[in-house]
């Protein structure tokens, strides 16, 4: 534990188009080599495509996709008496969002569509319908936590 005061998290500026902090964070996670304008263009194109296909509001589909990918519990390794246990722990809200966004971007990068915007749009539409690779990742994490429920008393 640090002896000095704990440094708070930096405030992130909302994105220019939709004024959403979540979307700005998503753009930052998608960004490669500091190319923010490219990442913004990809995200906005993907949101337009999603809104067109689903007939819902841009941010509504994005929020729904994130909600369906957010993990509630995860497992952390804990060494006790020479053996390592996978201990299920609840995920903090900030980490929930970060993991959900990271999993969405990873899943989109692995898809087969032509452009990144198309891949991202398809993955987010799948996530909003509770299917797709990102949702499967969340289910796997939850299943792992459920399987190791017996070690929950090792929490710290």
Curated annotation (Swiss-Prot):
It holds the Pfam family Ribosomal_S7. Keywords: Ribonucleoprotein, Ribosomal protein, RNA-binding, rRNA-binding, tRNA-binding. It comes from the Bacteria. InterPro entries: Ribosomal_uS7 (IPR000235), Ribosomal_uS7_bac/org-type (IPR005717), Ribosomal_uS7_CS (IPR020606), Ribosomal_uS7_dom (IPR023798), Ribosomal_uS7_dom_sf (IPR036823). GO terms for biological process: translation. GO terms for molecular function: rRNA binding; structural constituent of ribosome; tRNA binding. NCBIfam families: rpsG_bact. Part of the 30S ribosomal subunit. Contacts proteins S9 and S11. One of the primary rRNA binding proteins, it binds directly to 16S rRNA where it nucleates assembly of the head domain of the 30S subunit. Is located at the subunit interface close to the decoding center, probably blocks exit of the E-site tRNA. Belongs to the universal ribosomal protein uS7 family. This is Small ribosomal subunit protein uS7. It comes from Vibrio vulnificus (strain YJ016).
């Amino acid at each position: 534990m640090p002896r000095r005061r704990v440094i708070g998290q930096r405030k992130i500026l909302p994105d220019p188009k939709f004024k959403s902090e979540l979307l700005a964070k998503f753009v930052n996670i998608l960004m490669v080599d500091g190319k923010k304008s490219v990442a913004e263009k990809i995200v906005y194109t993907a949101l337009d495509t999603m809104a067109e296909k689903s007939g819902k509001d841009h941010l509504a589909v994005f929020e729904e996709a994130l909600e369906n990918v957010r993990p509630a519990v995860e497992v952390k390794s804990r060494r006790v008496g020479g053996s390592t246990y996978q201990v299920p722990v609840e995920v903090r809200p900030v980490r929930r969002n970060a993991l959900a966004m990271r999993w969405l971007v990873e899943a989109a990068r692995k898809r087969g569509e032509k452009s990144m915007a198309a891949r991202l749009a398809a993955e987010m539409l799948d996530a909003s319908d509770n299917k797709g690779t990102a949702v499967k990742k969340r289910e796997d994490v939850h299943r792992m936590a459920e399987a190791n429920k017996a070690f929950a008393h090792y929490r710290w």
